Amino acid sequence: MSRLIILLAILLSLDACTEQQPGEILRFDTVIENGMVLDGSGSEAIEVDVFIRAGEIVLIDELDSLSVNNELEIGQRIDASGHIVAPGFIDVHSHGDPLETPAFENFLAQGVTTITLGQDGYSPATENLSQWMNEVEAQGIGVNLAMFVGHGTLRELSGIGRDPIPTAEQMQRMLELLDSNLEVSFGMSTGLEYNPGLNAAEAELLALAEVAGRNNRVIMSHMRNEDDDAIEASLAELIAQGEYARVHVAHMKSVYGRGAARAEELLALMQAARERGYQITADVYPYNASYTGIGIVFPVWAKTQEQFDAALPARREELAEYLRNRVNLRNGPEATLLGTDPYTGKTLADLEQEMNMPFEDILIDIIGPQGASGAYFVMNDELQSRLLEDAYVGVSSDGSPTGFHPRGHGTFAKIIEEYVVKRESLALSEAVRKMTSFAADILGITDRGRVEVGQAADLIMFDPAAVRARATYPEPHELASGFELVLVNGEIAFKDGAGQSQRNGEVLRP
């Protein structure tokens, strides 16, 4: 009965929208027919056809019944029999350089039609983000792009750099830059575990949040410390910014935390904030290893090469002890898998054996704080899986076309393959909601993320049982499979396992 009610409501609303009269010649560029449509709302799939014109969904109806009283002119008909038709996925936290690798085939192959850049506090180093976006548009891009303004970049542009306290003039300049660039971006990102953002005090972050809130934008935060013994304080810092703006926890994790009960404690903190009127959301990726520069294990006073060189003569013993304790706390040297040459594919434990020296000495004498990047197996499956199940937690890849972590090529496929099909811990309709309408709501994107009349025709077609995340840590660049057709703005962008030469993406603006 509920299925019939949903279908009736859709059809009634669409009749009102389209105002088409019997006997008309109805022209459509594309019709996707015979599929089971998940509209992105979390409702169950219904069998209905989707009609597209000029890159937009213009009708949702049954083709056979529509053709009884109308003459139809259809450019192409796509038979989706036996497949799910859903909105294209939206990645709320992505990486990449669209001027260097504009195709973004890694995302298209896993059903992603919109990505977000300018993350972790870093955006293009320009005072006029709109100009850079125009360059991307002129070159063309394979997916849609939503931009963030990076807090760290704002610090650099306003002359603050790594200073802990801005001057009044610097602070005013930073606020002005944020305000002007929020006209074309969807929020501000912070990377408080990285330089220069880690130097920012609460007052600075609150002032920036006030500007973001005034523009109805979101704060997308790589929080100050994701370690299990510090994450409550990091959440509290972000929630305080929620007094002024919507706030979002990027790639939420509890490093070396354990168990579903621990996840419940963290989710309860966020729920308590919502009950006080704050708007706070989060995302996760479905892997138990993070990926970033090796500087993540170095102390705050030795993260840059300059800091490291200055500290080493007097504090070498202290640094060695810090590194030894921190790496062991993060599941030991065998849990750090390096992903950059000449160490690619080797753990710190492997290097210990090869070089016959303690890993802390290898980090100090050979690698240094900026000499490598790697995957860190520091997350607990039970904890992360419980986070994923929460209604206010979405999905991101935190990945890129060129990164050495499988999340950049596999995240969205793995959600379907692992959590929907194998574990059955997420209903397909809920998984799709997290990756479509919920993601759009987090970002403030109003014209994507749903199969509705008036929405952009970013659509995907797949058989859930056939979806595979093929990327692995040894082979992180293997494309996902199972997403047979991906439309971006009404045009085919990915088909039969390959991207198309035409780039159909748009650079989105609020």
Specify the residue positions occupied by each region the protein language model found.
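N-terminal metal-binding scaffold of metallo-dependent hydrolase/deaminase domains
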Residues: 11-69, 431, 466-474
